[in-house]
């Protein structure tokens, strides 16, 4: 399943989202969801402990000036890869 997180991690129940995930799932951080991937944050630790692949939309990182503060453990992608993720997963859930 592809999960997308577009809200700030302080404005949603990130632990609940992660409890729904399983190995092989992907999570894409976009819009304010990219805040969850800030280096050194507690939210990042939650993400890294989940059995999923993590991605973030480059345009949203750049729009928020976060490129230099973002974890290198999350793959930064463009819109073409976003489309590939949607094609890969039949089911999607937005948070």
Swiss-Prot record:
Q: What is this protein called?
A: Protein TusB
Q: What domain of life does the native source organism fall in?
A: Bacteria
The protein's job, in short, is:
Part of a sulfur-relay system required for 2-thiolation of 5-methylaminomethyl-2-thiouridine (mnm(5)s(2)U) at tRNA wobble positions.
Provide the leader sequence positions: none
Assembly and interaction partners = Heterohexamer, formed by a dimer of trimers. The hexameric TusBCD complex contains 2 copies each of TusB, TusC and TusD. The TusBCD complex interacts with TusE.
Q: Tell me which HAMAP family the record gives.
A: Thiourid_synth_B
Q: Which NCBIfam families does the record associate with it?
A: PRK13510.1 (NF010035), sulf_tusB_dsrH (TIGR03011)
Q: Name one GO cellular component term.
A: sulfurtransferase complex
Keyword Manganese (UniProt)? no
Q: Which keywords does this chain's UniProt record carry? A: Cytoplasm, tRNA processing
> Where is it located?
Cytoplasm
Where does it primarily localize?
cytoplasm
The family database entries (InterPro entries) matched by this protein are listed as: DsrEFH-like, Sulphur_relay_TusB, Sulphur_relay_TusB/DsrH
Q: Provide the family line.
A: Belongs to the DsrH/TusB family.
Q: Which organism is it from?
A: Serratia proteamaculans (strain 568)
One biological process term from GO is: tRNA wobble position uridine thiolation
């Amino acid at each position: 399943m592809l999960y997308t997180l577009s809200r700030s991690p302080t404005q949603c129940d990130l632990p609940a989202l992660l409890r729904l995930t399983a190995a092989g799932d992907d999570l894409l951080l976009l819009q304010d969801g990219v805040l969850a991937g800030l280096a050194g944050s507690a939210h990042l630790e939650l993400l890294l402990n989940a059995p999923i692949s993590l991605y973030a939309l480059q345009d949203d990182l750049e729009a928020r000036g976060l490129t230099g503060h973002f974890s290198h453990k999350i793959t930064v992608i463009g819109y073409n890869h976003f489309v590939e993720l949607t094609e890969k997963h039949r089911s999607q859930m937005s948070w």
